[in-house]
Amino acid sequence: MKILALERELPGSTGDRFQPLLKDEARRVWELQQSGTLREIYFHAEEHTAILMLECAHAEEARHLLSTLPLVQAGLIDFVLIPLAPYDGFARLIEGLTDGEQNVS
């Protein structure tokens, strides 16, 4: 299952508390990426918070993996998790084809 994880900084988080942990954070993110569970990572262009795409069996697994990040362990950040399902809207197009509609290409 794909899980979208949106970082949020927790109250009281200041830049000086982040700095000593950033190298270890990058190392752990790289490990998660190498393991195949972290598929993509981006920064929000306006807020400089992380947006991650994870591949996990369920949201609880994603929450557990994210809890291994040094910034999470230090209580500086947390994540909002959004489980994703495949888009099935294209089925509406195929329904018409099965009702005798011709495929015109």
What are these regions (language model features)?
Residues 1-105:
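Conserved, structured core segments of small domains
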